[in-house]
Amino acid sequence: MAHHKSALKRIKQNKRKQFRNKSIRSGLRTFIKNVREAVEAKDAAKAKEALQAAIPVIDKAATKGIIHANAASRNVSRLTKLVNTLG
């Protein structure tokens, strides 16, 4: 266990950030899953709608440092390509 006051504070801060990051990452996965499920159901309208909802969430996660910027870009690209296969 930490002995310094600053180290104890950092432990508390890290715990708070961990919960926040976990929540954001979980929500991110849910949005991505919604897009994939809509594509599997061959529902083009729902897939496009889900993609439009997912892109800002992915970008925000990258901005906050939850995921790497390149990972966010890759996710958006792959999901967009997937939705475009429906026509």
Curated annotation (Swiss-Prot):
**UniProt key word Ribonucleoprotein:** yes
Where is the region Disordered? 1-22
Query: Which Pfam families does this UniProt record tie to the protein?
Result: Ribosomal_S20p
Q: Which InterPro entries match?
A: Ribosomal_bS20, Ribosomal_bS20_sf
Provide a GO biological process annotation.
translation
Q: Which GO terms describe its cellular component?
A: cytosol; small ribosomal subunit
Provide the alphabetized UniProt keywords: Ribonucleoprotein, Ribosomal protein, RNA-binding, rRNA-binding
Transport recorded as keyword: no
* Molecular function via GO: small ribosomal subunit rRNA binding; structural constituent of ribosome
Q: What does this protein do?
A: Binds directly to 16S ribosomal RNA.
Q: Which family does it belong to?
A: Belongs to the bacterial ribosomal protein bS20 family.
Q: What is this protein called?
A: Small ribosomal subunit protein bS20
